[in-house]
Amino acid sequence: FLKFNASIKKETPTILTLVKHFKNQGYTTISNNKITHLKRDIKEWDEEWYPYEKGWRNYQSKENIRLEKKGQHGYAYENPDIDDAAYYDGKTANKSIVDLKKLKAEGKPFFLAVGFVKPHLPFNAPKKYWDLYKESEITLPKNTSFSNSAPEIANHSWGELRYYKDIPKKGQV
């Protein structure tokens, strides 16, 4: 696929998906969270689950939620002191553990696909994970120039990142 938003069904309508192959072999198939970029692009799952109760950015801080409700981008990251399950990836992990136990008890073959959204902008995670690293001990690379030997397609202007409130619209990131 050449674009991030390509549809499996539209681009390759006759392809036998991995999910369909497993179903054809008698497997129970479960999809938890983001497996393909487009939600519900593969129709063959026995069960397809998404934790999205509100916007996909899954902000938890009051300021970011307020900005998003106004149609604005919030900050590129947040680190509130909250439980893992407040974020979608925590919910996904918990649901997948429950599914694994259930599937094991059933004793039949299964294919469980588990998709985590992170690392993806915005870089939101509970404070305890940010506390594992001291910002002062993280060394940035000395050379941030674009390599002449790299393909042009690799060069970009940080477009997605620049949408966020705390990132400059131009210049160094």
Predicted segments with their positions:
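Formylglycine-dependent sulfatase
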Residues: 1-173
